[in-house]
Each structure stands twice: as structure tokens, then as C-alpha cells.
Regions:
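Beta-lactam-recognizing serine transpeptidase/beta-lactamase-like catalytic domain environment
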Residues: 2-13, 92, 214-219, 223-225, ...
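Periplasmic/cell-envelope proteins involved in peptidoglycan metabolism and beta-lactam response
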Residues: 2-297, 322, 397-407, 517-518, ...
Length: 603
């Protein structure tokens, strides 16, 4: 209505005249009209301001969103670094494989794509059809495809089908050192062992390919393509020696079969610096198929979750599990007694076959008793009642002090994940009985590698080293990138006590309980142990022996543990001979020559 003239003639109305004549306009309508006009103006102003903000302050954000709509990104996988032994022998490598994927919007002949991929990849047609017809930016059909098959698929030149090169982790020795090396997952990321611990160095950095697509999602042929090249991972050189690892594994298998044991572990280490030359845990598992059980499950296992069974199969007994060390721990009690001066080499103890502490009767393994013996022979004889007395003299405070000095109250810091810690009474809760049983290696639990580390410190002059596998990483041209350093605590014990203990432990092998580790022409030191497994009275044992060579200048130390052997279970009888056989084969290999035969064996 064209407003010409208006008069207020009635309450709430205006008389308005236009070209058609006069008419009445409700003033309430007028207010609504004004409100609508003002609202439209305000909304328009707001939108203009918002558009201005978008065009200025947020322009980069929306440009990025637009780019994302038209750019398609594909990864170029980095080659994972290899794992090698100390001599450059490859333990973990890579095999070129392919990843086959489809881009739905680019497919021109769905039926042909489905037929070719199902046939070449040996996949069910329905599964391929579902993925090909799925509307998504990219759909993976299959990974870890053999390169030869990937090359065949490329020859079809199928629109919308991408065949990208990838890498698959392979382990040339299958089961060798499986519980040390670990393995990688589908994305080539380390899951267990050294693969996981050194993943940052091994993984490298993936590259990428960026291509442009039109509004329909079709890749524009000949469009600008940006490539960011991958950075390959670094090679990891380890302390392992393949030849020693092979022999230790073979020996462990033979022992497990012979003794019908649950498992057998052998560790070989340099006591002067903590470099681990071998760590065998049998049964091992196949690194190239780590999700397949290494045994046929019995009825009881069949009821368990498979992941629980796999996790148990992957466990490294040497570091993931604890046990009561038994008589090998007597080396610690003896060391503490000498260091504190509460016992001298000429001190004697008379063993009658048992001793009583509070209300507890503690027996000696020789039920008729050892009679009177000096300190040195209490170690040779591994006499429990004698060590109860030496432990009493040392006292709780000093026992814990020297356990700490020898690394038994803390984790070793070994470069493998999942290391277990010590299980022990709080110091203030240790009474006479607890101290007595601790003195000969019961009532607390440690890992095998903790025990090996402690004995190494006792015989290497008193230096507490860090057991480890990693030496250094190198680039593809062989140049060293990262050299790993490990802590060493000097003077954990005095060099004088260390010298004394070396001589005593040499006597254990030459004339004490460890004679089955004796090798003519070599000076070997060591200590045996037979540990009862909990609960007491179960009839289950862990038999073990730690031996070092040579006794006067230890260059190598080895530990053998036999878990739940059948029949004879004494450590000196079944574990010591394993270390003897090991040393007969590896000592010449590492350059430790046999001395002139001892006179007592000349005839």
C-alpha cells in the first residue's frame, strides 16, 4: 500500500489514503512491520560482519578445509631398521610387500575390479564386493601382499585400484632369541622385546603422496603431485652373538627334553660391562607367526582365553618372572659377612644336620650334618645351618644394605620392557626366622637377571653393571648415529672381598657342590642352587647354577635355570653340567684358551 496521507481518527487506527482511496491501518500491525524490518537489518548486518571475519581472520582455516576436500593423501612407508648381532649378522629384516586399496569415486568398472582382486588376492568375492562398493575416501582390500602379486595387479591398470609398496618384518632365524627380539604388529610398530624398546630408533618416519581430485572425488590426471620422501629407520646393533645364542638355545632344548622340564633358561653375559651375549628361554616361539601357539593346548588350556595363552608364551622368564634364588644367594650372605667383618675365613661352624631359630627347625641338605667346617667350606658345602648363623651375625640392617648395594632391591634397568621387581618383606617386619631363611635364599623373590647381576658384581671387583642388549644404532650407510651408555656403580663391594669370593667360588667347582661344572684346563668358579617353588611341599623345584670363567679373571658369566625338572632336581647335579657343556664349546670361540692340563689329570 502506498501511504499518501494518514490521520489518527480512531483509537489504535490510522486513516491512510493511497491511489485507491482511504483505508484503516491497525497501529499494532505497524509495530510488527517495524520490528520485522529492524530484525532483517540486524541479521543482515550480523551476516555481513561474520562474512567479513570468515574472509579475513578465518580465511586460512576454510582454505585448508577446501584443500582437504580436494587433496588425497597416501602414505609412503618408511623402511624399519634392522636388528643385528654384535658381528653384523641380521636378526630382524624387512621384506617388500604391497598394500592393495580402492578409491570408490575413481572406479570405472566395478565388476572387473571385484573379479581381478578376488582372484589375485584369493579373497571371497562377497568380501571384496562389500569393500569396493563402500563409499569412502579409501578402502584397504589387503595388506602384506607378495610383491609379485602386487605387480600382477598393477598390469591390469584398473582405475580406482592402488597398489602401494610396504614392508613386512621377517626374522631369518624364526625362533632364535624370540623372547628378546620381540615382534611388530600389522602397522610395523614394535610390540614386544627389543622391537618395542627401541621402536623410536627403528621405526623411521613415513612419507606421503598428495594428489588433487575434482568435485566428484575423481583424481585429476596430470595434476600437481607432492611427495614427501620417507626417512628410513636406524639399524640396531646388539650385544647378542648369534653363535652363542644358537648353542645356548640348543642346549636349553636338550635339557628341557631330557628332564621333562616346564622351561629352561640360559643367560650368558660379560660380567665386566653387562653385555648379554645370549639369553635363551625355551620353549621359544616363531617370530614370523607370533600369534600361533607353540604347543597343542590340553583340555585345561583350551578353556582359557587365547590372548592369555599367548601372553604366557611370550613371557621372558629371565626378566618377567621372579623366583626364590635359593643357595646361589649364599654368595650375597657370604659377601656381606666378609664386608662387615662379622666372619673371618678361619671362623668355624659345627653342623649337626639342623638348627633351631625361634620355633622353626631348619634342616641341612646333609641330614647327618657336615661337622665342624671353616667359613670357606660352609660355602663349598652350601650348609644351611651355617648360613643361618652367618646371616644372624650380619643382621637385618646390613643384609638389606648389601642386597641394595648388589642391586637386589631394585630393577636392573635392562633394556627390555616388563621387568619384574623384588618381592621382599619390609625391613621393619623381618624377624629372626625371616632373616634366617633369607640367609640361604628363601622368603623373598627376585628375577634371574637380578641374581646374575649381583654375582657379577661379587666377582668383577665390586662393580654393579647394567645388563643390556643395545650397543648402537647406525644409518643406512653404516655410520654410528646413537651409541648407548649404561650406568655402572663402582665399589659396590671392596676389591679385596671380591678377590676372596672368586677364590672361594672356584673351590666350589673344584671340590665343593659344583664339581659337575669342572672343566680340565679351565679355572671355573660358581654356585649351585635348588629352590623350592611355592607352595612348600608341592614337590616342584627350580634347579640353577651360575658359573664364571676364568675364575681369576672373569670374562664371561653364565646362568642356567631348569624349571620343574622331573626326577633328580639338584642344581649341582643337573644345572652345573649344562654350564660345563656350554663353556666347553664357547670358551675357545670367545678366545679363552685352555690352560695346561692339571697335574691330577695327567695320568
Amino acid at each position: 500500500m502506498l501511504l499518501i496521507k494518514c490521520r489518527r481518527l480512531k483509537r489504535g487506527y490510522l486513516l491512510m489514503k493511497d491511489g485507491m482511496g482511504f483505508g484503516w491501518l491497525n497501529t499494532g500491525h505497524r509495530k510488527k512491520l517495524v520490528f520485522m524490518i529492524v530484525s532483517v537489518l540486524l541479521v543482515s548486518i550480523f551476516e555481513c560482519v561474520r562474512l567479513g571475519i570468515i574472509m579475513t581472520a578465518k580465511s586460512e582455516y576454510y582454505m585448508q578445509k577446501a584443500d582437504e576436500l580436494h587433496q588425497r593423501e597416501r602414505k609412503i612407508k618408511a623402511k624399519r631398521g634392522r636388528i643385528l648381532d654384535r658381528n653384523g649378522i641380521v636378526l630382524a629384516a624387512n621384506e617388500v610387500v604391497c598394500t592393495v586399496s580402492v578409491i570408490h569415486s575413481q572406479i570405472e568398472d566395478e565388476e572387473k575390479v571385484i573379479k581381478v582382486l578376488a582372484g589375485e588376492l584369493d579373497i571371497d568375492v562377497e568380501e571384496v564386493t562389500k569393500k569396493v562398493k563402500k563409499v569412502s575416501s579409501m578402502e584397504y582390500i589387503k595388506t602384506n601382499v607378495a610383491k609379485e602379486i602386487g605387480d600382477e595387479i598393477r598390469k591390469y591398470n584398473l582405475a580406482g585400484v592402488k597398489v602401494d609398496e610396504d614392508y613386512k618384518r621377517v626374522y631369518p632365524y624364526d625362533e632364535l632369541a624370540s623372547k628378546v627380539l620381540g615382534f611388530t604388529g600389522a602397522d610395523n610398530q614394535g610390540i614386544l622385546g627389543l622391537e618395542a624398546k627401541y621402536d623410536t630408533y627403528l621405526a623411521g618416519t613415513n612419507g606421503q603422496i598428495l594428489t588433487l581430485s575434482d568435485a566428484g572425488g575423481i583424481e585429476i590426471k596430470g595434476s600437481c603431485e607432492n611427495r614427501v620422501l620417507p626417512v628410513d629407520g636406524q639399524d640396531l646393533y646388539t650385544t647378542l652373538d648369534v653363535n652363542i645364542q644358537k648353542y645356548a638355545t640348543q642346549l636349553a632344548w636338550e635339557t628341557m627334553v631330557k628332564k621333562e622340564a616346564k622351561q629352561v633358561s640360559i643367560i650368558v653375559m660379560r660380567p665386566d660391562n653387562g653385555e648379554i651375549l645370549a639369553m635363551a628361554n625355551v620353549p621359544e616361539y616363531n617370530l614370523n607367526s607370533p600369534y600361533e601357539l607353540n604347543y597343542e593346548p590340553d583340555e585345561e588350556d583350551a578353556q582359557k582365553d587365547k590372548m592369555d595363552l599367548l601372553n604366557n608364551m611370550w613371557r621372558n622368564f629371565c626378566i618377567n618372572d621372579t623366583y626364590e634364588p635359593g643357595s646361589i644367594f649364599k654368595t650375597v650372605t657370604a659377601t656381606a659377612a666378609l664386608e662387615t667383618g662379622v666372619v673371618g675365613l678361619n671362623d668355624s661352624f659345627t653342623c649337626s644336620g639342623a638348627t633351631v631359630v625361634s620355633d622353626r627347625r631348619i634342616r641341612c641338605h646333609k641330614t647327618t650334618g657336615h661337622g665342624t667346617q671353616d667359613f670357606t667350606h660352609t660355602v663349598y658345602n652350601s650348609c644351611n645351618p651355617a648360613f643361618v648363623e652367618w646371616g644372624r651375625r650380619v643382621g637385618t640392617d646390613n643384609m638389606y644394605l648389601y642386597m641394595g648395594k648388589l642391586g637386589l632391591l631394585a630393577k636392573t634397568g635392562i633394556d627390555l620392557s616388563g621387568e619384574a621387581g623384588t618381592i621382599i618383606h619390609k625391613q621393619e617386619n623381618v624377624g629372626a626366622v625371616e632373616l634366617a631363611t633369607m640367609s640361604f635364599g628363601q622368603s623373598f623373590q627376585i628375577t634371574p637377571v637380578q641374581m646374575l647381576r649381583a654375582v657379577s658384581a661379587i666377582v668383577n671387583g665390586g662393580r654393579l653393571v647394567t645388563p643390556h642388549f643395545g650397543l648402537y644404532t647406525s644409518s643406512s650407510d653404516g655410520s654410528v648415529v646413537n651409541e648407548f651408555a649404561y650406568s655402572t656403580q663402582d665399589e659396590a663391594i671392596s676389591s679385596q672381598t671380591s678377590e676372596t669370593m672368586k677364590k672361594i667360588l672356584e673351590g666350589v667347582v673344584s671340590e665343593g657342590g659344583g664339581t659337575k661344572a669342572y672343566i680340565d684346563g679351565y679355572s671355573i668358579g660358581g654356585k649351585t642352587a635348588t629352590s623350592q617353588k611355592l607352595p612348600r611341599g608341592s614337590g616342584k623345584y627350580i634347579s640353577s647354577f651360575i658359573g664364571f670363567a676364568t675364575a681369576d679373571n672373569p670374562q664371561v658369566i653364565a646362568m642356567c635355570l631348569i624349571d620343574e625338572p622331573k626326577g633328580v632336581y639338584y642344581g649341582g647335579t643337573i644345572a652345573a653340567p649344562v654350564v660345563k657343556t656350554l663353556y666347553e664349546n664357547i670358551l675357545p670361540y670367545i678366545g679363552i684358551e685352555r690352560a695346561v692340563q692339571l697335574e691330577k689329570n695327567d695320568d
